[in-house]
Amino acid sequence: MEWIIQKTVELGVTRIVPVMTKRTVVKLDAKKADAKRKRWNAVSESAAKQSKRSLIPEVAPLMTYKEAVKEAAGYDMVLLPYESADGIRKTRELLASVKPGTDIAVFIGPEGGFEDEEVELARENGAEIVTLGKRILRTETAGLTALSILMFQLED
């Protein structure tokens, strides 16, 4: 998780929200989650300094999947990369319509992926289900791929 935080901060995220899904492998109790969060925020600060960012992205408290979906509904766009999504053309068209300054939430699945019910809940709450291509990517790779695509699309 520390490596993911470091790299996503370098790529420009403004907030990181750890989410407990049905297939999340590491389960943290409240005490452990709080200690981890302090460490993760220190990693975020270090990565922000290294990449010369003026904003230090917050690592939010651990959320349930339902809480995260509800919170994400307040963003301009919510993306959920999913291996069973329609082809790359729809994803390209959607990304081509995104303008700089758009607040985007991106859900990245755990090891083992999202369950179908989780994808459907996100869709029902306004998420765009997209693909990152025909390959199944590891969690770490999927997150960096999604952010790299967005960075390329949105940076001046």
List each language-model region with its residue ranges.
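Short, hinge-like loop/turn segments at secondary-structure boundaries
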Residues: 33-37, 97, 148-149
